[in-house]
């Protein structure tokens, strides 16, 4: 349920199918991990357990993982939750006096509930300020679009996405680097929202991802 084939993305339009397939796979990975601490992504509340880093390929914070952020130069000691950090979030708060950044030694991208709430409040203040400045309508760039947590996907799924779209990368990338590259491309795909939603609903109703995965696993 965490994979998709190039054929799947070509039916109903490459872009719409690709977006629908990635969203479906990320949602499925999150649902499958509900009993073990996996979550749905950047803006979803959740709770994790306490302490250091786990394997970079884990879907959701592992037992004993700490928040991946540094604040004022010090690594956060709070338990990692289900929300994840990204360069997009870093950019959205870079204009504020919030001295938080990703700890380069962290082997995951999950953050604690404290920092998740802090980031949300900073972004909300930014949106309100934009609304006040222009008389009620926030600038387009300040609209907080839903975030798909690509870190929930398996490494093989990310590699298949990279191969399908022929994304230029160097060999030996780890999961965090793949997520960043795939995420930048994924957010840049122009799609028709109606087509994407229609394809997504169709895939879910027909359990399409699961059947495609069985066929694809037989090929590989």
From Swiss-Prot:
Cross-link entry Glycyl lysine isopeptide (Lys-Gly) (interchain with G-Cter in SUMO2), positions: 87, 194, 205, 214
Record-linked Gene3D superfamilies: 6.10.160.20
Region (Interaction with SIN3A) residue spans: 130-220
Subcellular locations according to the entry: Nucleus
Positions of Atypical zinc fingers: 67-115
Region feature Disordered, mapped onto this chain: 123-143
Residues recorded with modification Phosphothreonine: 5, 145
Gene Ontology BP term (one): regulation of DNA-templated transcription
Superkingdom of the source species: Eukaryota
Positions of the UniProt region annotated as Interaction with NCOR1: 1-129
Sites bearing Phosphoserine, chain numbering: 131, 138
Tissues expressing the protein: Expressed in all tissues tested with highest levels in pancreas, ovary, PBL, spleen and thymus; lowest levels in brain, placenta, lung and kidney.
UniProt main location, coarse: nucleus
GO molecular-function terms, A-Z: DNA binding; transcription coregulator activity; transcription corepressor activity; zinc ion binding
Keyword tRNA-binding: no
InterPro entries listed in its UniProt record: His_deAcase_SAP30/SAP30L, SAP30_C_sf, SAP30_Sin3-bd, SAP30_zn-finger
Keywords: DNA-binding, Isopeptide bond, Metal-binding, Nucleus, Phosphoprotein, Repressor, Transcription, Transcription regulation, Ubl conjugation, Zinc, Zinc-finger
Substitution effect: residue 108 to A: Retains zinc-binding
Phenotype upon changing residue 67 to A: Abolishes zinc-binding
Entry keyword annotation includes tRNA-binding: no
Protein task: Involved in the functional recruitment of the Sin3-histone deacetylase complex (HDAC) to a specific subset of N-CoR corepressor complexes. Capable of transcription repression by N-CoR. Active in deacetylating core histone octamers (when in a complex) but inactive in deacetylating nucleosomal histones. (Microbial infection) Involved in transcriptional repression of HHV-1 genes TK and gC.
Subunit note: Component of the histone deacetylase complex that includes at least SIN3A, HDAC1 and HDAC2. Found in a complex composed of at least SINHCAF, SIN3A, HDAC1, SAP30, RBBP4, OGT and TET1. Interacts with HDAC1. Interacts with SIN3A, SIN3B, HDAC2, RBBP4 and NCOR1. Interacts with SAMSN1. Interacts with HCFC1. Interacts with SAP30BP.
Membership in a protein family: Belongs to the SAP30 family.
Record's protein name: Histone deacetylase complex subunit SAP30
UniProt organism field: Homo sapiens (Human)
Gene: SAP30
């Amino acid at each position: 349920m965490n994979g998709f084939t190039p054929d799947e993305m070509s039916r109903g339009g490459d872009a719409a199918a690709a977006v629908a397939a990635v969203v479906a796979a990320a949602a499925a990975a999150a649902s499958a991990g509900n009993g073990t601490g996996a979550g749905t992504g950047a803006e979803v509340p959740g709770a994790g357990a306490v302490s250091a880093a786990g394997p970079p390929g884990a879907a959701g914070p592992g037992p004993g993982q700490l928040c991946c952020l540094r604040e004022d130069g010090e690594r956060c000691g709070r338990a990692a939750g289900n929300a994840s950090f990204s360069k997009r979030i870093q950019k959205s708060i870079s204009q504020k006096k919030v001295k938080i950044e990703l700890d380069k030694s962290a082997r995951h991208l999950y953050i604690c509930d404290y920092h998740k709430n802090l980031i949300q409040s900073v972004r909300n203040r930014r949106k309100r300020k934009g609304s006040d400045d222009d008389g009620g309508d926030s600038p387009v760039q300040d609209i907080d679009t839903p975030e798909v947590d690509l870190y929930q996907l398996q490494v093989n799924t990310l590699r298949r996405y990279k191969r399908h779209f022929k994304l230029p990368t160097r060999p030996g990338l780890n999961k965090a680097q793949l997520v960043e590259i795939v995420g930048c491309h994924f957010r840049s795909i122009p799609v028709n929202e109606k087509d994407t939603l229609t394809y997504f609903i169709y895939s879910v109703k027909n359990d399409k991802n699961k059947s495609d995965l069985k066929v694809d696993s037989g090929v590989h």
